[in-house]
Amino acid sequence: MVLNIKAPENIVLKPTITVFGVGGAGSNAVNNMISANLQGANFVVANTDAQSLEHSLCTNKIQLGVSTTRGLGAGASPEVGALAAQESESEIRSYLENSNMVFITAGMGGGTGTGSAPVIARIAKELGILTVGVVTKPFHFEGGHRMKTADKGLIELQQFVDTLIVIPNQNLFRIANEQTTFADAFKMADDILHAGVRGVTDLMIMPGLINLDFADIKAVMSEMGKAMMGTGEASGEDRAIKAAESAISNPLLDHSSMCGARGVLINITGGSDMTLFEVDNAANRIREEVDNLDANIIFGSTFNPELKGIIRVSVVATGIDADKVPTYKPAIAETTNIVPEETYNEPIVQPTQIEEIPDFNSYSTENIEITDSPINQNFIGNEKELGLHANSFNKSEDDSPKPSFLGKIWGSLRASNNQTLERKNIVVNTLDQDNKESDIHDIPAFLRKKRD
């Protein structure tokens, strides 16, 4: 009897993380991560454009929809992109089967990324893989049609991913300047994906005092909806606080606030000189941003000898409540109910038939007495500026002048209590031709003034 005694195989069990680039934008993001020598992840690119695949640095390539597109691209049609991914479903599934977590990166608004990314996410979910979407939205100069296409693609993609991170390309103008090249600007957006993947892989493969396992990460990111990722590095005085603040204030993300987050993953990495107080300061600074007392906050700390003198803080906040996220609203988008000012219409002048015009020359002016009082010079010529109007004056039976033939045409005006006007008063005393009342004459209407 022969006994075969063998040493047990040393099987290393570790989670497999796959970064899946879809379309032109997704392929470029993967190229940037490969160039940065990102460790701990597998890379796959898929595209309908055969020429783009040839220039990819990734070794795992999928030509989507060979029969559907013949390698010529999706022609900016999401429907064609979806059909191409469905045609290549078996090949996509083979690259995803052994993965525990997948990052799907694509650009929304085109044909391949918008149409194929949701199909790939659906396949990943069917395989029980933790799925994270990291996608970009078009620039404003790309037009409204492309933006609407992107929004539809986001709605479709969100149905199949556990966590979704959206990076509007327009936000690149927040950090770019006149010397920033087009390639460098897109690399800034790709750095968000790079930092997110690195933050997860470092927690699982780097040595540290507080290590996290994949179950911890899954608890924070599974079925959490919209999320934000951020990373920050700092050195010198207060480096821990500065790195934490840089991580939680990413200008490229739409939802760059952690308000209302239901899950938070914190990774603090530094060299051998990182102190306990620095770790405490960085972690507490991030916790201050979370106003949800029931949030699941998972913390890890690792060492990296390459970061001597530097502290790096990576944050993944998931389940962000959109109602609590402060978003920028341009002034032109705000509407205000404007109550129109009250308008006053000029009184309609009804012409009065003049039966007889008196002969003014027949009246004597020898005993006319004229009394002047000061006039408010500010009033003259400024009736419109003062807001005075014919309807602003009130007329009463007691103090109104008696009607005359001119008064019937012009009306009699009396200033309101708030707009009292000192007028020039002309007091005319004449003898009454008919001797009806003492010795006062009957004065013409344009000279008549009621006596006090």
UniProtKB/Swiss-Prot annotation:
Compartment(s) of residence: Cytoplasm
GO molecular function, one term: GTP binding
Membrane spanning residue stretches: none
Keywords (A to Z) from UniProt: Cell cycle, Cell division, Cytoplasm, GTP-binding, Nucleotide-binding, Septation
Pfam families: FtsZ_C, Tubulin
Summary of subunit composition and partner proteins: Homodimer. Polymerizes to form a dynamic ring structure in a strictly GTP-dependent manner. Interacts directly with several other division proteins.
Protein name: Cell division protein FtsZ
Protein source organism: Rickettsia felis (strain ATCC VR-1525 / URRWXCal2)
Gene name per UniProt: ftsZ
